[in-house]
Regions:
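Solvent-exposed interaction surfaces and binding hotspots enriched for charged
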Residues: 2-112
Length: 112
């Protein structure tokens, strides 16, 4: 178990695996960037993929489409709440580390 020294939070193996999966998906998105796809387009595709995957995950355990449809608003509320919190946390982190992250992004672009 490691520690996030910035927030003084213990990082469990499960959390490490969570962040590694997220980083892998971000790497796939970054590899889509190029002359035919800018960050806004890739971001839109990533959001669509997340929505599509989430709909599939949310359907697990339902036997009838009608029952699934009845839960639509609760499912949306759950995912919107999760996304809002994750986006808020990441915007705060990015603002607090803006100069560092901009330098990392610049270094990545220079390496290409």
């Amino acid at each position: 178990m490691s520690q996030d020294t910035q927030n003084n939070v213990e990082i469990t193996p499960e959390m490490q695996a969570f962040y590694q999966r997220a980083d892998s998906i971000i790497a796939v998105a970054n590899n889509q960037l190029g002359p035919d796809a800018h960050s806004g387009q890739v971001g839109a595709s990533l959001l669509y993929a997340a929505a599509r995957y989430s709909a599939s995950v949310a359907s697990i355990g339902f036997v009838k489409g009608d029952d699934f449809a009845k839960e639509k608003e609760d499912i949306i509320e759950f995912y919107v709440k999760q996304y809002r919190q994750m986006l808020s946390d990441n915007l705060t982190d990015y603002a607090q580390n803006f100069e560092k992250y901009i330098q990392l992004n610049k270094a990545d672009e220079d390496a290409k």
